[in-house]
UniProtKB/Swiss-Prot annotation:
GO molecular function: structural constituent of ribosome
GO terms classed as biological process: translation
Pfam family, one: Ribosomal_L17
Assigned GO CC terms: cytosolic large ribosomal subunit
Similarity comment: family membership: Belongs to the bacterial ribosomal protein bL17 family.
Quaternary structure and interacting proteins, as annotated: Part of the 50S ribosomal subunit. Contacts protein L32.
PANTHER family, per the entry: LARGE RIBOSOMAL SUBUNIT PROTEIN BL17M, RIBOSOMAL PROTEIN L17
Name of the protein: Large ribosomal subunit protein bL17
HAMAP family cross-referenced by the UniProt entry: Ribosomal_bL17
Organism of provenance: Ehrlichia canis (strain Jake)
InterPro entries xref list: Ribosomal_bL17, Ribosomal_bL17_CS, Ribosomal_bL17_sf
Keywords per UniProt: Ribonucleoprotein, Ribosomal protein
């Protein structure tokens, strides 16, 4: 039975696990779409959702405190600035559900289930077709 089991361990120490999730959070905020294994994507989702909510709460008021709080959590000023300046404006009218997990088959080497985790409502670069 899974009583009182909160998170996955990923066969890592707690410091390694937190560093991995922190790096994945920063990558997702910067690139807005990353590919990883399905369990890692499922574990990453609540961390990113909470960071975006913090950015939304402190966007209008207490901006300096909000930036300092995000920098203390994710240790990356560029990602914290993007959370406050870009993502909090984009998700101003959305109450949660900022990420999407798309299953992406299996990895060739070890058949691990892969997934793409991305931010919803992101800008997609379009390529024009010349009609050829």
């Amino acid at each position: 039975m899974r009583h009182r089991v909160a998170h996955r361990k990923f066969s890592r120490t707690s410091a390694h696990r937190m560093a991995m999730l922190l790096n994945m959070c920063i990558s997702l905020i910067k690139h807005e779409r990353i590919s990883t294994t399905l369990p890692k994507a499922k574990e990453l989702r609540p961390y990113v959702e909470k960071l975006i909510t913090i950015g939304k709460v402190y966007h209008g008021k207490n901006l300096v405190y909000g930036k300092r709080l995000l920098i203390s959590k994710i240790k990356n000023p560029d990602a914290a600035n993007k959370l406050i300046d870009v993502l909090s404006i984009r998700y101003k009218s959305r109450n949660g559900g900022y990420t999407r997990i798309i299953k992406n088959g299996f990895r060739k080497g070890d058949s691990a289930p892969m997934a793409i985790i991305e931010l919803v409502d992101r800008q997609i670069a379009t390529v024009e077709n010349n009609g050829s």
